[in-house]
Amino acid sequence: MSQSVPMTEEGYRSLQDELKHLIRVERPKVVQDIAEARSHGDLSENAEYDAAKNRQGFIEGRIKELNDKIARAEVIKPGDVVTDKIVFGASVTLFDVDTDSEVTYKIVGEDEADLKHGKISVTSPVGRALIGHRLDDEVRIKVPSGLKIYEVVNIAYM
């Protein structure tokens, strides 16, 4: 059996929205583009046709991928979590010992990760290192630039 894919409700909705858009908008558009390119004659040297067929392949592949992820989705509601440990869905504020600064991350599924918005994947090196820690724990994380040392100063589930 396939492994479940943990994600937040927001991430699940985002995948569903993308799937609907691909099926309702992008797929019909590319079919129309292929038909139009075909009408231009010789397909062997028709760049428009080749581009549209490539786009169709990408769209169909992405639809299949999204259907698979949605079917295997395990929606986790952070508000339902009762624990003092860092787990999936937690918003974690860390104090960087080296820079005397704080950073907050929300631990989310792979498809939801967006570092610009403070969302890190549960499978990322930082996400994996944080899982299971508690308030006031010191967390050592190996990053490309070396070893980072953080102190967990807040854990929230919203």
UniProtKB/Swiss-Prot annotation:
**This protein's name:** Transcription elongation factor GreA
- Per the UniProt record, one Pfam family is GreA_GreB_N
Tell me the GO BP annotations in alphabetical order. Answer: DNA-templated transcription elongation; regulation of DNA-templated transcription elongation
* Coiled coil segments of this chain: 48-74
Known Gene3D superfamilies for this protein?
Transcription elongation factor, GreA/GreB, C-terminal domain, Transcription elongation factor, GreA/GreB, N-terminal domain
Query: Please, which domain of life does this record's source organism belong to?
Result: Bacteria
By its UniProt entry, which PANTHER family does this protein fall under? Answer: TRANSCRIPTION ELONGATION FACTOR GREA
State the Gene Ontology terms under molecular function. Answer: DNA binding; RNA polymerase binding
Which NCBIfam families does the record match to this protein? greA (TIGR01462), PRK00226.1-2 (NF001261), PRK00226.1-4 (NF001263), PRK00226.1-5 (NF001264)
Q: Which UniProt keywords apply?
A: Coiled coil, DNA-binding, Transcription, Transcription regulation
Query: Would you identify the family this protein belongs to, as annotated?
Result: Belongs to the GreA/GreB family.
Protein function: Necessary for efficient RNA polymerase transcription elongation past template-encoded arresting sites. The arresting sites in DNA have the property of trapping a certain fraction of elongating RNA polymerases that pass through, resulting in locked ternary complexes. Cleavage of the nascent transcript by cleavage factors such as GreA or GreB allows the resumption of elongation from the new 3'terminus. GreA releases sequences of 2 to 3 nucleotides.
Q: List, alphabetically, the PROSITE patterns matched.
A: GREAB_1 (PS00829), GREAB_2 (PS00830)
